[in-house]
Amino acid sequence: MVAAPAQPGSGGLSLCLASVGVVKALSVVAFKLVWTHSIEKTEWQEDWRITPGGLELMQARVKGFGAGMEPAPDARLVDGWFQWQPKRAAMPEVVLANSGAAGEWRLCSDGHCETLSGIFGHPIGINVTTMRACDP
């Protein structure tokens, strides 16, 4: 598991993931979301923080560019990755779709990554997963 299950009454916020009628709460305050673009086969990474206002995107990185993967105009090239800090408000929820064409979303925390199917304990296939900040 990418993080320990959230403990009710432990205070603070957790990351809640919902897919196919199952909800998982993870005790993390920040995480990295990683996926491979279905057409370009290029890796994309995003660093997220859980806040009382929702999920806040702190930094995005893409290894290259192509169809629908253009780095932001203020991106810098660092060690082969285009990196930038998106300027957007925290979001109450983030919906992750999966075409099934390029592998799964991976969630990373404390140097360990796991697929969403691994976190849920069963294949999620092309089903949508919703992420949101939640109280454990």
What are the roles of these predicted feature ranges?
Residues M1, G53, A133:
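Residue-level marker of positions within ordered structural domains that often coincide
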Residues A3-P8:
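Boundary at the C-terminal end of the N-terminal hydrophobic targeting segment
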Residues G9-G66, P71:
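N-terminal secretory signal peptides
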Residues E70-P136:
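Mature, soluble, non-transmembrane domains
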